């Protein structure tokens, strides 16, 4: 959530930055007007309360002296009624302010490219060279069926579209991947966490999914619970409402969890395969850092995600998302896109973002600075390290062989009991 004081004191800068994120200046102008009206009413309310205190003292004095206080009582009742009217106005204005400010996206960092959509994203670097196949490549969904490791038909029967069963060496490959990813992140200083897979609405608000993106989630009927769309939500909210010791920062968390997404608005996109599912595993990274360290920590986090792809030998590229393509809470985002041979293109496999103090303000996560003793909002960062199903897809396609088998990447073999290849039955 943005700082209302910043909007008030640096309106033009904030308006220009949010314009690049699709927010009209009229919206901010209305917010500023509401804020000014609210501040005026607060002054009036305080003045009236002072009048009421004076009147109350005068009434008490008159009663002690057994004088008629009828007029003073009438005056005080009128002042009290005026205060109640103003308080009701303030409640209404506070709600209007909340309705606006809670759905305003974060302001982009100055280094973020300005653009409307993914066409305006900027490639930063590439790693690896896509393999030159001398046979016709298969899509990962066909490989999965031929190898009897992915069962789409029964997934659809048991649950519905965009669900599947992993089986045999497919299940072992999925498990090997997330164990490998977790081990790599632990080496980099991340604390492993097993989170709840349901969170409450306050947690969804804290990380920015609520109230704006409710349609993208699965809520449990007649409860305050939501199935997590990513482990970012419980990990970030771990410290919600707390004040941390500045000496402890930065703090690194990692977790593997299922992610549940309704994929609202994705009808017709990626209807086959592992790219877009309602339920998938993902290894998440979350950091809590001081403001002066957070962008260095973003570079480190991105490197941690890249490390996984490099050790798996999967070609990828790093993209800096433009203002029009970033997520709601992000101030800056790098996407990692892995090479998918059957589609002859790169597809997103990780997003690493610095939200600065946007989530921390919503969730009230603060720290006490050891230098000056002041309590300050910290910065939160999050990143995929990696989306496991999409990594399975990338391995199946990039490591496929002409005979229909798939070679298992060397780093995963110790996690799969020494297996070296997945062969057709």
Swiss-Prot record:
PROSITE patterns: AA_TRNA_LIGASE_II. Belongs to the class-II aminoacyl-tRNA synthetase family. Type-1 seryl-tRNA synthetase subfamily. Its EC number is 6.1.1.11. Homodimer. The tRNA molecule binds across the dimer. It is found in: Cytoplasm. ATP binds at residues 261-263, 348-351. The gene is serS. L-serine binds at residues 230-232, 284, 384. One of its GO terms (molecular function) is serine-tRNA ligase activity. Gene3D superfamilies: Bira Bifunctional Protein, Domain 2, Serine-tRNA synthetase, tRNA binding domain. GO terms for cellular component: cytoplasm. One of its GO terms (biological process) is selenocysteine biosynthetic process. Catalyzes the attachment of serine to tRNA(Ser). Is also able to aminoacylate tRNA(Sec) with serine, to form the misacylated tRNA L-seryl-tRNA(Sec), which will be further converted into selenocysteinyl-tRNA(Sec). InterPro entries: aa-tRNA-synt_IIb, aa-tRNA-synth_II, aa-tRNA-synth_II/BPL/LPL, Ser-tRNA-ligase_type_1, Ser-tRNA-synth_1_N, SerRS_1_N_sf, SerRS_core, tRNA-bd_arm. It catalyses: tRNA(Ser) + L-serine + ATP = L-seryl-tRNA(Ser) + AMP + diphosphate + H(+); tRNA(Sec) + L-serine + ATP = L-seryl-tRNA(Sec) + AMP + diphosphate + H(+). Pathway: Aminoacyl-tRNA biosynthesis; selenocysteinyl-tRNA(Sec) biosynthesis; L-seryl-tRNA(Sec) from L-serine and tRNA(Sec): step 1/1. It is an enzyme of class 6 (ligase). Pfam families: Seryl_tRNA_N, tRNA-synt_2b. Keywords: Aminoacyl-tRNA synthetase, ATP-binding, Cytoplasm, Ligase, Nucleotide-binding, Protein biosynthesis. This is Serine--tRNA ligase. Consists of two distinct domains, a catalytic core and a N-terminal extension that is involved in tRNA binding.
């Amino acid at each position: 959530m943005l700082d209302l004081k910043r909007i008030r004191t640096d309106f033009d800068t904030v308006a220009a930055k949010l314009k690049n994120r699709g927010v009209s200046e009229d919206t901010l102008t209305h917010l500023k007007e509401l804020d000014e009206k609210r501040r005026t009413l607060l002054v009036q309310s305080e003045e009236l309360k002072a009048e009421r205190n004076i009147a109350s003292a005068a009434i008490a004095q008159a009663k002690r002296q057994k004088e008629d206080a009828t007029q003073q009582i009438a005056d005080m009742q009128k002042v009290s009624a005026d205060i109640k009217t103003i308080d009701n106005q303030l409640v209404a204005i506070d709600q209007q302010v909340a309705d606006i400010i809670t759905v305003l996206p974060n302001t982009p960092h100055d280094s973020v490219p300005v653009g409307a959509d993914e066409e305006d994203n900027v490639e930063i670097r590439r790693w690896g060279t896509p393999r030159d196949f001398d046979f016709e490549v298969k899509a990962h969904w066909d490989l999965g069926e031929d190898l009897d490791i992915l069962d789409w038909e029964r997934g659809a029967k048991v649950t519905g579209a965009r669900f599947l069963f992993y089986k045999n060496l497919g299940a072992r490959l999925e498990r090997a991947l997330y164990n490998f990813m977790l081990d790599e992140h632990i080496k980099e200083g991340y604390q492993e966490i097993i989170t709840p897979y349901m969170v409450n609405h306050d947690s969804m608000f804290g990380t920015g999914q609520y109230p704006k993106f409710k349609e993208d989630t699965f809520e449990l009927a007649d409860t305050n619970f939501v199935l997590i769309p990513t482990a970012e939500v419980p990990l970030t909210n771990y410290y919600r409402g707390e004040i941390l010791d500045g000496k402890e920062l930065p703090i690194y968390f990692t977790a593997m969890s299922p992610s549940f997404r309704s994929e609202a608005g994705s009808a017709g996109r990626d209807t086959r395969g592992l790219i877009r599912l309602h339920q998938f595993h993902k290894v998440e990274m979350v950091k809590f850092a001081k403001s002066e360290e957070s962008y260095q920590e973003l570079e480190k986090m991105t490197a941690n995600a890249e490390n996984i792809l490099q050790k798996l030998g999967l070609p990828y590229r790093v993209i800096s998302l433009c203002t029009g393509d970033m997520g709601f809470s992000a101030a800056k985002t790098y996407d990692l896109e892995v090479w998918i041979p059957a589609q002859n293109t790169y597809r997103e496999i990780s997003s690493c973002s610095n939200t600065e103090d946007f989530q921390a303000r919503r969730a009230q996560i603060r720290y006490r600075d050891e230098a000056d003793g002041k309590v300050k909002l910290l910065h939160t960062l999050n990143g995929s390290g990696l989306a496991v199903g999409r990594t399975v897809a990338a391995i199946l396609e990039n490591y496929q062989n002409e005979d229909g088998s798939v070679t298992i990447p060397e780093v995963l073999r110790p996690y799969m009991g020494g297996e070296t290849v997945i062969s057709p039955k």
